């Protein structure tokens, strides 16, 4: 069932039919059989026309032009042909008819079959939904990964976020505040006393000049009267109330609470501390103190706008001089402001009017207070009497809505703030106490469709619209009573007419202008339920405004809490996956509202009553007919029996094939048929038409000659189909086919001339294959060996001796006459192949004569490429551990196969991998290329067992010093300082979650997981990250498993000398769990290094394009040195000393952020590094050995670690060749040095090198590090031109040119694997064209690539296609040199 479902979802290919079509088989069976026969000879195939879904086959008439004698006459004739109907992608129901002559399927008017249409549409919808589901899963996986990374970065940044900074005060505010305090104190100590002079001496005017004796005279004032009333109240209270010291103290100090100076001090201090601009309030307080406005000014401030506030300042200054004039001035200022600001809008003008009235009232009230000498608390009580009635309505309300000038609610405030509860945090305590510690849900992601909204401009306002089907939809109140509105979409403006107003709903449907055909159409939600809803509208500046909330259905409306801005009415309300729910309408402050839009809201076409009655009658008849359509006739019953027998025969054939390994259809009878066909024998022609059909065609006007020609054409089509069936089933059983006539049925089912057993067995007699001379030597074992066949006990019992003699002879031939997959010199290949073929035929014929199926008739048991791993039982989680291989390991064999003598053989594991590889692919596509330049010095790597022993030499050259740090402390210290400075940006790096690491998941998952899964991607798809997480926790907890590495040799283009010497590179690959553990520690650092290639030495992650190569060479030249060095090692990875590699790894751990440098992480990382240096390696032979040297070439950070080591070596080398310099001098001169580094490749500029630099560094690397540097690999020059880096040579204009063009040619004409098609070959040559662009036009490689591209382009065009891409010189210049700055 799983296989059928999978094939149904994929497009039908050649020879593969959709499972729905195979099962349902709609239409005429004879038409179906005939249709597939015609499809084989047709120029266009049904599999290309219908990608999936059931097909309906039927016979029908087709009018064609009459052709006679090669002349087309304008007369149409009618022929009988096959009509095929189905549903294409996009839910288009189409019908195609086969047209003779052109032999192709041509589209005709559709012949609708309801069942085919219904199932076809469902299949197309299922395919689309399946594609959407896969895409959604991919996006979900990507989003989860991004969320994990962002969460990790967020947690790290939160820890690094500094605390809140202390607020600083402006100098001007501090100075003015000091002035305010001084002024306030001066005003507080100032007092006025009125009295009468008692001295008798008077001057001429009757007034004493100096009064030494006087008495105070208390004039009447409100202050004195209220003070006396207050004292009387206190005296009365003292006589009747019980004695209370606290109460006496409170009543005694009560007047001071209403004191102006205390209030001014508190207000001023609060503004200086908390306000951003306190000067405005300080100015007001100073002027209020000066003018005696005092508390009246504070009460008036909340009701003043900017003009009236300035008016208050002016009035208070005048009030201090003359109170009566100040009252007049306040009136004049208010009138002047009201006249000057007449142009304001109503809202602002109303605020100004209120401010002016407040200004005049405050001035008059201040004059009364001053005149009556009223105390401060009297002023406070008067102000409270004014304000309390205004807020009574607010006190009893639950909330306060603040509306804007347009009447819409801008803000809603809670009228019950409960400040104490809020500040105490009691509510938060309960929330924290009952909140779950683990988050159980996430906010949903939403699907937003950009550029899908239009703007509706009507007379009464503006709104939003969107497309549904072929209508524009908006809110009814946006359009109003208009019948035509203006519509804008991006830069396209058009007009739309009202088509339909939905009854009882505020929804209007408009016509869709022709210019908006590409506007996205919203699809209706299948059901409308409560849940998350999304409102998308046009925001300011054309940007999308998105609101997300929880919606609740109320009748035919939905409410949600989303604020509404101008122009949002008519916006679509959708689900999180973009399905339409309704049309947005209004905002009520707390909730938004939308009208639900359903499928029934579209205008429904009214059907004629007669048509409706007929449809009801047809439905009733079809329902009644369904009970009578099962095998109603004898032909149906016979058909059912034949179909059942066909299925049973297919099952039996498959079971027999699987059980006995029977080869498919290679019989003597079959070869007779094919031989007869090749010799020109013809079978008896069958009937094309029945007698009734033939007479009908004659009556329609066809002549006998025309019908004879049509019959011959039909028979030729049948022959083509049968030939195809013969080819397709040449290695298979004959397929089931319907009989052509009743006579065949009678003969096959009831005839008496049945073959005997002996005549049937004679069909299986082996025949000698005359053509074996083309067999390649590397294919001898595959062609003639018996190990690919199932051999039973009966075979061994009767033919064991013959089989042994045959296999011994075959092994002797292979060992004696072949070497490394090629014939030995002076070998008569023709005689050897004939001899092997004769022995093969003799063995098979002997078995046939004794009644046993020969090997020629048995199926080879070759392993197939599976989409999944081998069949197995349920997996035990312990089998996924890193050290499970130790439980599987058996003791080693007595001898050695692939392990060198100086390496131990620890044990043996069961593994089935090839050891030798002598395959040199022969790609027929290469015959399309013109003759290539000579590249015989290179070829594809091939190897035998000796190559594995040779590959271990990469770890051996010379012995390094026991302690380099101890023997060379000065050089070691300087190298460590350079390392720290060069990679200072690694400080603060982090450890990533193992599930968030990135790695090539298409790589092998090593042993033993490779027994079950081919790649890590397959392993992850089945097991997920559960094994990764559990193993990470186990190791972090203290486990230290031994890790197994799988070794294989690399298939690549090498020099022929290396291939002949079996010098092939080895690659080791560890378990993906181990790789991702290391990646968790190092991926962040690796990413940081890839982003610093422009300014730092390591170049992993760089690009030579867009002037990248030239800029880096210019960076070296900018040091203004005269020494440039091209430096390369031999066996670099394998000979890196353990001491250096351990130092590099220790440095990397020290660069982690402090919170990650825990003891547990350090111990885990140390285990990881130890496993890199002490490796248990599995050979393809099953042998397990141990490697303890070098940087493994398959670990996750091989290149990055090589870069770090290269920087260390270079700094050590620089100090070594300058022994006369101190550490400080070395640091100074190092600033003038620079390098480009990629693994073991290095291009350096030094300020100075000694004359014997090459010899000194060659001996230094050998004696100190035990590494191999060949003198010819160290090139010293005074210019970078001519030196090479990363396979490029620096050209005269500092642009890169390929260094080894012969190797590129060899990889083209002698590739390591075959290419898929001619387009892939064209693309490969195009890559060479790009690489060789900077070569001179006369260069042989560049001229060849240009010619090859043109030749391949012509071939592609001759095949009816077009070359994938055409690259011009200008484009290549831009690619290499970059665009304009």
Curated annotation (Swiss-Prot):
It comes from the Viruses. The modification O-(5'-phospho-RNA)-tyrosine is found at residue 694. The chain crosses the membrane at residues 169-189, 249-269, 279-299, 324-344, 365-385. GO terms for cellular component: host cell membrane; membrane. Gene3D superfamilies: 3.30.70.270, Trypsin-like serine proteases. Signal peptide: none annotated. Residues 856-879 are annotated as: Disordered. The active site is at 477 (charge relay system), 506 (charge relay system), 569 (charge relay system). GO terms for molecular function: ATP binding; RNA binding; RNA-directed RNA polymerase activity; serine-type peptidase activity. Belongs to the astroviridae polyprotein 1AB family. This is Non-structural polyprotein 1AB.
